[in-house]
Amino acid sequence: MHWKVAVGVLLALPGPLSAQAAQADSVGARAESAAAVLFKGGEVADAGRVFLGGWAGLVFGEHFMLGGAGITLLEKVELPGSESGTGFDLGMGYGGVILKRWWDLPGRLTGEGGLLLGAGHATVNDRRTGREVGSENFPVLEPEAGLAFRVFRRVYIGASLGYRLVWSIEDLPRVSPDDLRSFSGNLSVRVGGR
């Protein structure tokens, strides 16, 4: 289900938004759109995990993008259990406003930097019963930097490194902010932008 939504956004968004922006602003600078599907690898509670996400936004002057992003953990993390042997599962997702900036490099390469500022939500469930034993909303700040390779005219494959910073985790049993903070390696397919 996640991939269907991501592919739909990737295919549907860039065309209609750039057409609307072109009609609304025929005199000044033209705003276009860009969208991407991304995979993030990093740690959650000392376990290597993969996240699936995407972002979409308006591109101004070919080099600056303002939009929104959403990212979810693909597989829950098993947390240590209590003395009775019951284990717990941690799930999380986050999203928010995303800013991107692209720089022209030689050939088909583009440098990119970005910042996501938003919020996340995590839950801890009893593994045996599935009952939620804790949940928490928390702020997220995630900078990243990387390179993108232009495959076609407006299609790019990118790789970047980032760091997910979270804080104010108080109501999740067996979880601290350090369990949700992590460096990440990111792979993306983007349509639009520079």
Protein language model features and the residues they cover:
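Bacterial N-terminal signal peptides
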Residues: 4-16
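Extracytoplasmic loops and strand-loop junctions of Gram-negative outer membrane beta-barrel proteins
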Residues: 36-40, 81-83, 127-130, 170-172
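Gram-negative (and chloroplast) outer-membrane scaffold detector with strong preference
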Residues: 63-141, 149-151, 191
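Outer-envelope beta-barrel architecture signal
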Residues: 27-33, 62-64, 107-113, 153-157, ...
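Predominantly the C-terminal beta-signal and adjacent terminal strand-loop region
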Residues: 148-194
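Short glycine/proline- and aromatic-enriched beta-strand/turn motifs that initiate or cap beta-hairpins
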Residues: 19-66, 184-194
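Transmembrane beta-barrel outer-membrane domains
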Residues: 28-30, 45-49, 88-94, 134-140, ...
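Transmembrane beta-barrel strands of outer-membrane/channel proteins
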Residues: 33-41, 54, 58, 68-72, ...
